[in-house]
Amino acid sequence: MDTPKVLTRDEAIKIVREYKKIISPRFNGKAKVLMYGSYSKGNANPWSDSDVAVVVPKIDEDKWLETSVALGNDSDKVSLLIEPVLMSEEHWSPLYDDVMQTGIMV
């Protein structure tokens, strides 16, 4: 079995930009899209995925699951490597802090 090719950071960002174009209308352009994880930190390997945070100002809890599933379906239209995570600015988490500190705004 051949080892998969490691994307460059620029190649990963290009893929995430395509994804952002697809999802932006869902949030009326108000979502921040950040690439975080191995590609943003510069330590991606052949099995790395593109961790993508979709940060919205606010989302109703009853819409959270539905929106997360839709984001996953949208990511499959661009690349199976994209792993989206929905986040809200009003609900703090340690992951949110990490994304904001190390993520690359796309």
Residue ranges and their predicted role:
Residues 52-54:
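Short beta-strand->loop micro-motif that forms the acidic, two-metal-ion catalytic signature
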